[in-house]
Amino acid sequence: MKVYNTLTRTKEEFVPLEEGKVKMYVCGPTVYNYIHIGNARPFIIFDTLRRYLEYRGYDVTYVQNFTDVDDKIINRSHEEGISPEEVAAKYIKEYFVDCDGLGIKRATVHPQVTDNIQQIIEFIKELEDKGYAYAVNGDVYFDTNKFEGYGKLSGQKQEDLEAGARIEVNDQKRHPMDFVLWKAKKEGEPGWDSPWGEGRPGWHIECSVMSKRYLGETIDIHAGGQDLTFPHHENEIAQSEARSGKTFSKYWMHNGYININDEKMSKSKGNFFTVRDISKLYDLEIVRFFMLSAHYRNPVNFSDEMLNQAKAGLERLYNTKEKLEFTLSNLVESPLTEKEVELVKELDDFRQKFIDAMDDDVNTADAVSVIFELAKLINSNVDENSSLEFAKKCLDEFNELTGVLNIVNKKKDTVLDKDIEELIQKRTDAKKNKEFQLADDIRQQLLDMGIVLEDTRQGVKWKRI
């Protein structure tokens, strides 16, 4: 398996630090609002990577944090008239609601910053003792000039970063790129006792500390959105490696941006959508399928047109599975035919093609294409004359590959509304009585209700559209 490592800017063979085990950290949300569609992409992508690694037999420890103390949370608490703790608790709960809709598994650990304050203070103290941090008026900063490798993740030299960055003027800093590790408490803000006075952690230190606490000083994969490469992940490397003297993460993986209708998403442009907004218009499995239909490092354009294309594609896969299950339920035990023996070999080829795609830098786009090829084979070769064994093998293969991506696994509603059931029966009776115009009218009525009928030898089949 190869993955693209942002640190080396090359595809590298994936070799975990410990055979059979993977330690993985993915930056989680700052919990002050519902997550937006840009947040959803890394959460879906790296959930899929985790699932694939587990499919290949790895024992994955997957850590994703919650930033539950932050300026945005404090501001939201003032707006809503509740405490920062209540804001964080509310949006952590809502985050999991969205994750369930998107098919995202719970992490092995979901640490929160406020549960790790003492560990953060100890980490900063070590940096200060080693000369990498300095305190000014209750704030503590990381001295970027002291860390020789600063800029290696983003591929820039310190002087280039300083020249190109939009830097807030701060007379307390020794150097423009120095970043805060500990913030002195301001009135109306939460704070904790520390050697530098009451205060709270800076953003960057949090992930370094929680990664160390739950995964150790060196991990296999650190991942997140491309926007986190600099400064967040760059700063994580600096403070972690300055403290330990060891490589922080062997592989760094970042997904590309999301544009909305060909424009960068932003609140000022009014094209900012939360996952909760989208869920009112589309099943969130469609969003997951949409994200997986593109390579994770490529930018993607999010629009109604693209979502409707994803919906149609996902519906085709559901129809394949539904038809296969329906056919299977009507077959009796019978051996494989000569043709089916050859087709079973093709089924194995599909599994290998799928693995080859995922092994090539988690190419979910190609993996999805393989699943469509498999669906085509199933649709062309499974019918009422198929052997039970062949149909079972097809379903097992289909479920295995879609299961890795966690798509096409929802149970469709098997209970028809009474009105729909009555209409289908009326149409059946009309056909028996040769009232073909009435039968056609009922078919159209059902179509208007989102129900498509298919007359087969086994009887009338239906599906929702």
UniProtKB/Swiss-Prot annotation:
The keyword Protein transport does not apply. The keyword Ligase applies. Its cofactor is Zn(2+). ATP binds at K267. Zn(2+) binds at C27, C207, H232, E236. GO terms for cellular component: cytosol. GO terms for molecular function: ATP binding; cysteine-tRNA ligase activity; zinc ion binding. Its EC number is 6.1.1.16. A motif ('HIGH' region) lies at residues 29-39. Binds 1 zinc ion per subunit. A motif ('KMSKS' region) lies at residues 264-268. Gene3D superfamilies: Cysteine-tRNA ligase, C-terminal anti-codon recognition domain (1.20.120.1910), HUPs (3.40.50.620). Monomer. NCBIfam families: cysS. PANTHER family: CYSTEINE--TRNA LIGASE, CYTOPLASMIC, CYSTEINYL-TRNA SYNTHETASE. This is Cysteine--tRNA ligase.
